[in-house]
Amino acid sequence: MVKSVALIGLGGIGMLYDLKLPNSVLSHARAFSEHNSFKLVGAVEPDETLRKVFYKNYNELAYPTLAELFDHCLPDVVVVACPTNLHFTVIDEIFRFYNPQAILCEKPLAYCNEDAEAINNLCRVNGVKLFVNYIRRADPGVLEVKNRLITRDICLPFKAVVWYSKGVLHNGSHFLDLMTFWFGPVQSIKLIDAGPHIGEEDAEPDFHVDFVH
């Protein structure tokens, strides 16, 4: 059964990353529009120029507000790709209109534990599946490593060195999630160096992590 999808936010990951790359799939808009199991039915974007770009490329309307989108359609899946500081506000507003089957939220889910837990609780009490866009969990190679860990073709303990850039929340968290997927929950974290700040909300610390396995 084909699932309908709406996008909240038409910035880089929402639409722009692959706009001039016709042979690449780097955005939610391109990914859902080319997948046979989904139908892109609309979007929300405050920037009028981006709304016009969306319509030109995907032949679907983008609206300035959630209310206008949901007057037009009630999609099965809502993709939250707006700035991180708006994630809680947007998801809370979605539930004021209806309960979608699933919400796919860009990472990081939030900048603080309080907001992240509030988002998780909102989805839980409303019976809506919440996914955070840590795409490596769906990568065939990653799944093969996971299977080999389960079958003990790869034996623990295991040591990994990860280099990342553009912030621990926005990019480094991909690898923390990958390590927990492979090795289990985080047991302890030791800060080695605080590193530089990346904007107001992110940084690039060096740290040591032990995982339960």
Label every model-predicted segment.
Residues V77, L109-N171:
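A contiguous active-site-proximal alpha/beta segment in oxidoreductase catalytic domains
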Residues L156-H213:
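Rossmann-like dinucleotide-binding domain that binds NAD(P)(H)
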Residues M1-N57, T180:
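N-terminal Rossmann-like dinucleotide-binding module
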